[in-house]
């Protein structure tokens, strides 16, 4: 059953505070809005907004270009904020999980156990993001394999493997083969379904479209991030919440 976030003294904020970059890009590039370059960049800005506002990703930068290695965006993901707010609600620090997991032959140490030992730095992750602004087609296994290759290029040291998560963003759902593939890879990968910004009567509806619709962690990521409350954070819509104090909890 989905919990009612209103029971935790939540204050709602308008989504428009994250629309500045989108609005500026659209206004500055009206003369090329029919081009694929415009549509691709618009989608990247849309993804940036959704990651910043809903997953608390910070320091986001566009790096797309001829030498991007298949990566369009990079950023920092400080999971501590999400964990601490979800811990107020779900009492996550009372749970016990295995110290080591194995997925596809790779040994994984869940971040949560490091938190219990006082190592809070393990919650500061890097993200690499690839955006596919497909209007109708779905991300293919070939494109997902290329993303895995891009991850390996950017994270070529063993110490980087559990500190960096790669994200694929597209407006459409994964195919069954795509889903099978991402769960078989030996890297932390998240698939995000983010819709396109709608153009209504020559005006872009940045307020009501371009939303994060689905969030899917592959098997590796689920083990790495287990008991940090990320899925629950999204399910309850707490990215719009003010839970800065235990006094807010009722």
From Swiss-Prot:
Q: Which Gene3D superfamilies match?
A: 3.40.1350.10
Spell out the subcellular localization from the entry. Answer: Mitochondrion
**Which InterPro entries does the record associate with it?**
RRG7 (IPR018828), tRNA_endonuc-like_dom_sf (IPR011856)
Provide a GO CC annotation, any one: mitochondrion
Q: Where is the signal peptide?
A: none
* GO terms assigned for molecular function: nucleic acid binding
**Keywords attached to this entry:** Mitochondrion
Which Pfam family name is an example for this entry?
A: RRG7
Q: What is its main location?
A: mitochondrion
What family does this chain come from, according to its entry? Answer: Belongs to the RRG7 family.
**Name this polypeptide is given:** Required for respiratory growth protein 7, mitochondrial
Q: Which gene encodes it?
A: RRG7
